[in-house]
């Protein structure tokens, strides 16, 4: 597949964030986030993918064609990974006030993960500059299905953001891992963790999780859901500063989750999320 030449023009934002809001849960088009419960082979979301190396930016001194403004107020960094809006591509939206450039180095880092940016758009609103990337796998031309690779995309983008905008490091939980300056404030996991499950039509439920962010969180959430034989049909994973917000469309044997199963899922997630240092083998 030919590499895309990015020529996105600035425009006013219209419906920038395709996120499912906490008060409106309208059905979206069927997405291709592969199911996790024992489905047919073509629908399997693999959890055993080999570890993916997260490429780092080539230079921390460059600004990736963006603004390196060091004002007192650092905007909240946001990275949204959306598997709902486009049936053919994974949509990623990146925001850091008005400081981001064209992210060409970030797109090169994504290419090193075996991915292709097939479309890019840029828009402006009162919160700043929003860059959207439509991403597919180079090997298949299809959207990303593996949670490990989705997490690698998230970490790659955040790593590059911190490399080019080190002032964002203290605003991100992952700044303690990738950045020169860890967060100045710590999030109380017990207070920050919220888990809600809603009915979302005749064949699925909507799981909404908000908690303190940490590396590998997306993969951990998917694994916990899979361990209960619940299927993730599609979803979205947002990184907003020190917090992470997941919105997953889930089902059990093609049906919404009954109340008892909702409670099992919520308890399992809460147990894990409130023990961030728990090793996988002890769960």
Swiss-Prot record:
Residue ranges for the region (Disordered) are 14-78
SUPFAM superfamilies under this entry? ACT-like (SSF55021)
- Transit peptide: where? 1-56
- Keywords noted in UniProt: Chloroplast, Plastid, Repeat, Transit peptide
* CDD domains on file: ACT_UUR-ACR-like
Miscellaneous comment: On the 2D-gel the determined pI of this unknown protein is: 4.7, its MW is: 36 kDa.
InterPro entries membership: ACR1-12, ACT-like_dom_sf
UniProt keyword Ligase present: no
User: Gene Ontology cellular component?
Assistant: chloroplast stroma; chloroplast thylakoid membrane
UniProt protein name: ACT domain-containing protein DS12, chloroplastic
- Start and end residues of each ACT domain: 91-171, 206-276
Q: What induces it?
A: Repressed by drought stress.
User: What's the superkingdom here?
Assistant: Eukaryota
Q: Where is the composition biased (Low complexity)?
A: 48-63
List where in the cell it is found: Plastid, Chloroplast
